[in-house]
Amino acid sequence: MPAPADREKALDAALAAIDKNFGKGSVMRLGDEVRPPIEVIPTGSISLDVALGIGGLPRGRVVEIYGPESSGKTTVALHAVASAQKAGGIAAFIDAEHALDPDYAAKLGVDTDALLVSQPDTGEQALEIADMLIRSGALDIIVIDSVAALVPKAEIEGEMGDSHVGLQARLMSQALRKITGALNHSGTTAIFINQLREKIGVMFGSPETTTGGKALKFYASVRLDVRRIETLKDGTNPVGNRTRVKVVKNKVSPPFKQAEFDIIYGQGISREGGLIDLGVEHGFVRKSGAWYTYEGDQLGQGKENARAFLRDNPDLGDEIEKRIKEKLGIGARLDAPAEVDVEEKVDF
């Protein structure tokens, strides 16, 4: 075995050759540079940001959001788009389902005039467009809605009864191999919305599975299972849903945490409702009977009145949010564009 000095010299020569051939930084020691905190895009729900462990969806990664129909998958994705845009970012939406409602997106805070939208004809076209946008380096977030609607060209051009086993799975596998590296270099967050199917003949365990094969399960850094658990009513009139999200996979923080929040019809995720829930849980907001109080000030009788009070007094909501994030250690929220210095983006 060569002497330690000779090994170090040989390694330095190899690293110099790699830098010359492939560019500086192609290989580096993790301890050479101080790694900044993971940049994130807030989800619009403080409870979900807390469950994710880092304050939002990680940038430069693949995120999968799946669940039953009308559970709130697209709503969560659109809130993330709105958060990215508010921080000055550029967003794209690949509408493979041809079902995007611009009016609803605008109500959630999405700048629909600036949103890049594509309604592709085939799955290949959708993923090629996504790849080109990601490789431009200008994008902060891209949403593909949905994986189930990414129909391969061969299936579209074939007859209705033809068998096309594994085509979509191969398409997704090839696409994810291409775009994962590009996402990391560009700092773009890619959200894949997915649907549920049931496997036939399952005797034990859950028969539920997602479409598009197994590649997305492997490449995703975060997987969110979105479920509607309750209908919110004003008297007898339904006004929204209580939604539970389980973080079933998380490569950037401990997984399996859960978040619950309210989605109000026509308004999206209730930020104020989330602040009240977490405020009560962590002792910042006091609940006595039906009354909610904060620092001796009454917020209202009943959650709806307290929610309305915080909506009318946004500074108070910001104060509660700041205290919650400081206590839970998720204050280092990096939701500004990637080119901004890390020190400028930290908000405690």
From Swiss-Prot:
Gene Ontology cellular component terms for the protein in this record: cytosol
Function: Can catalyze the hydrolysis of ATP in the presence of single-stranded DNA, the ATP-dependent uptake of single-stranded DNA by duplex DNA, and the ATP-dependent hybridization of homologous single-stranded DNAs. It interacts with LexA causing its activation and leading to its autocatalytic cleavage.
Record: residues binding ATP: G67, P68, E69, S70, S71, G72, K73, T74
Name of the protein this chain belongs to: Protein RecA
Gene3D superfamilies: P-loop containing nucleotide triphosphate hydrolases
The encoding gene: recA
UniProt record similarity statement: Belongs to the RecA family.
GO biological process assignments: DNA recombination; DNA repair; SOS response
Domain of life: Bacteria
Organism: Kineococcus radiotolerans (strain ATCC BAA-149 / DSM 14245 / SRS30216)
MF annotations from Gene Ontology: ATP binding; ATP hydrolysis activity; ATP-dependent DNA damage sensor activity; damaged DNA binding; single-stranded DNA binding
